[in-house]
């Protein structure tokens, strides 16, 4: 990649160091990863020479020859030159001549466009190639399809001249340990890709420097001291950038510099030194210091802004290209924990014990037998826009407070009086946030004062923890909201943006604010909710210190970088009051770390605390031995200041990744909601001679238990998420680029052409004819010659749709067979339905075992039946990939909602971790929601016959109650009271109809399968409405014979079950003659 100051080189090295870090964290894992990757190392016992061996994806082992960096290959006279070198040097020379030839007014815009073109070619072009190579092996497949590396002597290479040219070019560059004919295709493809990278990166850096030259000038009125300082700082940054690049290349060599692990894997010692110990992703962070040094020397805002654009584009390259490949290649999810025989025995013994889960709604998870010593699993996090929940009082209060502060800030004038009030308010809230919270944490650390307060009133430690998180969050919101309000009051728009350093101050201030946001995001990413809210002050346990993320390089990043934003506000406002607030904030934050955090950490972790961070160690190693002994405060301040610069980019990556990922997800959702429509108006010429009757599709899947038959055909209803096998039939001369896709029946109105994008839900019929591998996932067999019903030979094959190639919803779908990579439809399958069977609520008697039995196959389908993540039993833990990829939990949440009518958040599925825990949660939710299940749809909906029976019974009971009330009650108040009690019984009849049988006694009721007491209080308006309805029912009853009415008065009254029979009436003791309460 880039040498010297070039911008992009950093990627490969940086990403590789990140991978090494992940592997080095566990030596056994690292060794296993190397062994699994086939990385072999052979050393000569008599010399220091070491040969490197690589392994291709198909297992081929080969010797990786030694190569040289780009700059030395191009510019060193000792290195052999070839045609590609001449072309690159000629293009670079053309750039220089263009700068000399262009007139002055055209130099800046022309070279701005040229540089942006090469930057786009780097970040977008190379990024697209590497992304497809990582996911689909696109570059290697291109080489296989064109056969450019096949020896022409075999008569299989259609480009013999190109073959000879490539052979001469590559062997000239690598004179030893390399044979063009014997090298694997992956390595040769990588060598050709390197030449393209050399061209793009050299042109990228050269055009940037020429653009800076075109923009450079000497500011009018600048003093000599300022000029010397500007150039000195710029030269230092450029030299530092040069050292970063050279040291990075020394560590990772050309293999990672040119993204070699996208093509093959080699042996690589897990070294972690040099620049990679100073900063994360140094090629993306400090590796761009030279750009800002050149901006200083050019004294041009144009160069500064285009440098910022280039830097941001490089971070996007890291987020979308490097990091996904790193995670896929070097950080696969750990294997799922399998249940041992002892665990299964203990689990089964627990299952045989009497279950009391159905009798209590406050019981914890089934496995819990002792109070938890640690915090509850973080399911509903507090921080982040994604976790905003207006049903939660903390979130609602935070929004209302911010709206109130905003309204007061905007609606009040910016007079000195109001400015003083807002600054004083910000200072008070900073004192509350630092001193007040610090005092509470100190008391909690010493004597658990916060937890004891809640225990005194019968609450649990978990409740104390939740209340603490809300208190800390609200105080933090008020602290920063009041500070922003004070900044708003003290800020005035500049009259002239070009005057002095006004624009520079705003740019630097915005950069510092962004730095604090990135720092906070990185700290939260490393610590999580538990660490962010100081969870180790509240829960004691075997806590283990881990220095990952930003803490790998800094011990206390919030000490400097965490307050960068307040100093950015100082730069933007140039206000003494804001400077006072910034100093106050910084002093209080340092005091908080020194007097609150540090004592608790020393008490909790003792000698396991790290003394020096990675950056400090690296700086100490560069000092002479005499200076290494000095550990004064001056050294600390210097180290912390240097760490500030290092942490800038470290914290930038995760925040930028989160923001860009959110943007991509939103855009993807829009495209899915409004899919692009492709209209094909002409029929391909190669369709001539093909008969669509020779094509056919048959589908097989896991039948749902709710199959229906209509006429002679049985409706095709498949289980949610189950793989669907498609058998296709085509003529022997069918195109090898045919493909089968899955659509909703309503997606396409035409049966000749598919006009809607398949959105990735398609599988090719034959392997090796597309440039990606995703479309080949699912191919079982291809071009099996069989005889059809007309005794003609046809080609058949099978493909299977599973995972992301399915629709994870309910509906009616169809498969379509398309011709030659186009959208012409040759065959359409029978429509089939994907349905989630509704759980039978009549058999739902808090029977957790039945819920587990119904839920297990659904969960396995949602997890793609992958043995690494899908559980085999209800007790088995979910695989760790469920935690990483949220799509699996979302599938389960949708299925649970459709099956049981209970809506969970995806975090609940990840937190439960087993089918048994999830089933328990469903049962518990059903018990809690049982009193509110008076719906007119679903399994509990009464039929028309039931409603008639209910109306008849209700009328008889109401009439009897009114007669008793008139005879026995002597006052209107007592009549109304008694009527309320008995009408409660009548009104509650519908609520309990889902149960098998419900008996009602005087003034109380006890459902046969519910622990909820009845009657439930009913509003007076409902009683009045029922009273009016009772009068109508009474009128109907009066038409009956008086004898029947008297008989009903003396008889007991009972409520009927769902299918009432004459024998199902049970007698209640008559209330006549009894004393009424």
UniProtKB/Swiss-Prot annotation:
EC category: transferase
Membrane-spanning segments: 86-106, 110-130, 196-216, 224-244, 278-298, 301-321, 393-413, 420-440, 483-503, 507-527, 576-596
Lipid metabolism listed as a keyword: yes
Keyword Lipid biosynthesis assigned: yes
GO cellular component terms attached to this protein's record: cortical endoplasmic reticulum; endoplasmic reticulum membrane; perinuclear endoplasmic reticulum
Keywords for this protein: Endoplasmic reticulum, Lipid biosynthesis, Lipid metabolism, Membrane, Methyltransferase, Phospholipid biosynthesis, Phospholipid metabolism, S-adenosyl-L-methionine, Transferase, Transmembrane, Transmembrane helix
Topology term for the membrane: Multi-pass membrane protein
Catalytic activity: a 1,2-diacyl-sn-glycero-3-phosphoethanolamine + S-adenosyl-L-methionine = a 1,2-diacyl-sn-glycero-3-phospho-N-methylethanolamine + S-adenosyl-L-homocysteine + H(+)
EC number(s) reported in the record: 2.1.1.17
GO molecular function: phosphatidylethanolamine N-methyltransferase activity
Topological domains annotated Lumenal: 1-85, 131-195, 245-277, 322-392, 441-482, 528-575
Entry's localization field: Endoplasmic reticulum membrane
One of the GO biological process terms: phosphatidylcholine biosynthetic process
Ranges of Polar residues composition bias in the record: 342-361
Database matches in PROSITE patterns: SAM_CHO2
Protein name in the entry: Phosphatidylethanolamine N-methyltransferase
Species of the source: Aspergillus niger (strain ATCC MYA-4892 / CBS 513.88 / FGSC A1513)
Biological classification of the source: Eukaryota, Fungi, Dikarya, Ascomycota, Pezizomycotina
